[in-house]
Amino acid sequence: MAFNFNWSPLTADASFYKRARDLLTTALNKSPKPPIIVDDILVTEFNLGSVPPELEILEIGDLAEDRFRGIFKMTYSGDAFLTLKTRVQANPLNTYLYSKPSFTSPEPLAAASGLTIPLQITLSEIKLSAFIILVFSKQKGLTLVFRNDPLESLKVSSTFDSIQFVRDYLQRTIEGKLRNLMMDELPAIIHKLSLQLWCPEQMSKEDHEKTNEMDEQAVNPFASPPLDAVDAHGNLLDPIDISSIAVNGGAELQSLFSQKNLFRLGNLVNTQLTSSLFTPSVPEVIFRAKAGPVDKPEASSTTPLTTPSLVKSHSFHGTSTVYTFSDTSSQNNGQLPSRPSLVSLGSATTGLGLAASRNAKPYANRKKKTRVVNLRRKTDTAASSEMGDTMSDSASVQASESITMSDSIPEDPEEQPELTMSGSSRVRFGLGGERSALPQRPALRRDLFNPDEATASAEISQPQVARSTPEKETAAPVRTSENDKRSDSKRRGPRSETPSVILEQAWIMKMAGEIAKRVYDEKQRNPSFWDEREDSPPPAYEAQPTTAAS
């Protein structure tokens, strides 16, 4: 298969060369230039020569009347040349003679003043050899892609050929730049030139767009004063004053603003200070909403010093016992919460929720996944809920965390359940008769605990006996509790506590008494075991007496 490659029309078209020079000039000045070049690079002469390149077909992928795609091997060794002009800044002290190592010569070397020299470079004897992918279409032009570095060699001639080191430097620098130019910029240049030959309508469209861009002149708003100019205080200026300012200097002229524009800006600022939904439109202005440190809600909020509130609820036949570790009342008094509160709610809330006081969520009471392990047994829940059922109806259901009540606690003549702690850690309700059968003795070391809790426990320490028991047996505990209440109210003053708080304190003191009782019984049962703990230390830790030298 053979085809003709006509090279002569390209070498004879003057408009083709003119456009090629413009494209090459743009491509050479696009990339960053070396610091030695202080001016733009201009392509003054460009000629493709009379010798066409040699093409060898390796593969044809698509072939039709209006399109072609294939892979070629191209070799070129013709008479094409390219001439460039620019200006360089030479440093007379730096001679580029690398006869000495760089670490022995002082750097940088500079002259007192820069020396600018015009430079003309001619590229000739260009030899190319590369594998190219060629895609042609009458609608899209010619696309050329190099698969390898096409430049083999070229000759660089300049005005500094008489200086050997300058000639070598220019040869190395221009070869490196030309390789990058042919790999990156040359395919785009060839594509634009092919559009000019086969698709002139597309080129005319691009030229028209560039002409429109060049016709648009930038308007300087400060070049001429506004018609209704005002000074810094907002007062209108006379045309005579404006003309005098324009003649004397331009600094004050640029500081003049239009009264109409200032009025618009003033309305825009006022809309931000009020609740008006109307925002005036200012031409050529971009509106951007930016939240400052005052507008951000997180910046103004402070982190509470107390721990987050813990809410635990269990549901049992429509009733629930909620243990609430509250910090609202303690924060009002300026102190940390001292003890938990026991609240009986007649609701069917379930789940275990942990919610922070500052970031409370609406789903805080929802049951979560095994984040908190309940170590209590189910019997504790049933017992606590049954105790809440037997309480008096006079204590109304309260959902708030802190409840204020009077000092007097109404006593129910009905049977009052008693909390007992057995060895199996079960909560049971026993009668007064069973309690009287146990040996009565004071608890050991009651002064170790908080005096407030100890005093509060005395109010419930004596149980109430059923109606069937004699009144003589119940008279003494009742009097004792009443006397304790009077002395406690005189000593501590008025306070607000719910019966649930008192019951919980009594239960805590009950547990402490049982623990102390067990420790005491254990010591009485095996006193020798505890005496061994107080033995003298082993001999290894005793200080050895020093013997006098004989």
Curated annotation (Swiss-Prot):
InterPro entries: Mdm34 (IPR027536), SMP_LBD (IPR031468)
GO cellular component: cytoplasm; ERMES complex; mitochondrial outer membrane; mitochondrion
GO biological process: mitochondrial genome maintenance; mitochondrion organization; mitochondrion-endoplasmic reticulum membrane tethering; phospholipid transport
Location within or outside the cell: Mitochondrion outer membrane
Record has Plastid as a keyword: no
Regions of compositional bias (Low complexity) in chain numbering: 300-310
Domain SMP-LTD: 1-208
Keyword Transmembrane appears in the UniProt entry: yes
Basic residues composition bias: residue spans: 364-376
Region annotation (Disordered) ranges: 294-313, 358-505, 519-550
Biased composition (Polar residues): 391-407, 458-467
SS bond partners: none
Bilayer topology annotation: Multi-pass membrane protein
Positions with biased composition (Basic and acidic residues): 481-495
Alphabetized UniProt keyword annotations: Lipid transport, Lipid-binding, Membrane, Mitochondrion, Mitochondrion outer membrane, Transmembrane, Transmembrane beta strand, Transport
GO molecular function terms listed in the Swiss-Prot or TrEMBL record: lipid binding
Family classification: Belongs to the MDM34 family.
Domain notes: Lacks alpha-helical transmembrane segments, suggesting that it resides in the membrane via beta-sheet conformations similar to those predicted for other outer membrane proteins and porin.
Assembly: Component of the ER-mitochondria encounter structure (ERMES) or MDM complex, composed of MMM1, MDM10, MDM12 and MDM34.
Its job: Component of the ERMES/MDM complex, which serves as a molecular tether to connect the endoplasmic reticulum (ER) and mitochondria. Components of this complex are involved in the control of mitochondrial shape and protein biogenesis, and function in nonvesicular lipid trafficking between the ER and mitochondria. MDM34 is required for the interaction of the ER-resident membrane protein MMM1 and the outer mitochondrial membrane-resident beta-barrel protein MDM10.
Stored PANTHER family: MITOCHONDRIAL DISTRIBUTION AND MORPHOLOGY PROTEIN 34
Record protein name field: Mitochondrial distribution and morphology protein 34
